[in-house]
C-alpha cells in the first residue's frame, strides 16, 4: 500500500560516489564495488528523503545499505536520460531539416548571383 512514483532519479544517482574497497574482515583481500552508506545517507538528505529502509544502522553503529533499493532510482534515472535523449534527437532532426533548407537557399542565392554576373558579362553594353 501507499504506492507512489519515486522522486529519486538522475539527480540522486549523479550524487552517489561509486567506490572500490576491501572489507576489513576479508583475509582474501578481494576488491568489492559499491557506495559508502554514510555518503548515501547524506545524498538522501540532500534530496529531501529521510526515514527510508534503504539504510539502517545496527546497534553497533554499523551502516547497512540495501542495494536492491537503488534499482528504482536507477530505472528512473535511465528513463530521465531516455526522455532527454529523445528531446535531443528531436532537436537534432529540426536542426538537420533547417540546415537542409538553408543549404538549398544558399544554392539558390549562388545560382542567382552567377546568373546576374553572366547577364552583366553578356549584356550588349559590355560588348
Which residue stretches match the model-derived regions?
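C-terminal intramolecular chaperone/auto-processing assembly modules
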Residues: 1-3, 51-127
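Residues that recognize and position ribonucleotide moieties
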Residues: 33-34, 63
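Acidic glycine-/aspartate-rich tracts in secreted/extracellular proteins
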Residues: 18, 26, 45-48
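Active-site and glycan-interaction determinants of carbohydrate-active enzymes
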Residues: 37-59
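Periplasmic N-terminal gating module of Gram-negative TonB-dependent outer-membrane receptors
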Residues: 3-15
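Active-site-adjacent substrate-recognition loops and nearby beta-strands
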Residues: 1-6, 20-33
Amino acid at each position: 500500500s501507499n504506492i507512489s512514483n519515486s522522486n529519486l532519479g538522475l539527480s540522486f544517482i549523479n550524487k552517489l560516489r561509486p567506490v572500490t574497497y576491501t572489507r576489513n574482515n576479508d583475509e582474501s583481500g578481494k576488491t568489492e564495488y559499491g557506495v559508502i552508506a554514510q555518503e548515501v545517507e547524506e545524498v538522501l538528505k540532500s534530496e529531501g528523503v529521510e526515514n527510508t529502509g534503504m539504510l539502517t544502522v545496527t546497534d553497533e553503529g554499523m551502516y547497512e545499505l540495501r542495494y536492491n533499493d537503488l534499482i528504482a532510482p536507477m530505472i528512473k534515472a535511465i528513463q530521465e536520460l531516455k526522455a532527454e535523449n529523445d528531446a535531443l534527437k528531436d532537436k537534432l532532426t529540426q536542426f538537420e531539416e533547417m540546415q537542409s533548407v538553408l543549404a538549398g537557399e544558399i544554392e539558390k542565392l549562388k545560382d542567382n548571383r552567377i546568373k546576374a554576373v553572366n547577364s552583366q558579362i553578356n549584356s550588349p553594353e559590355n560588348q
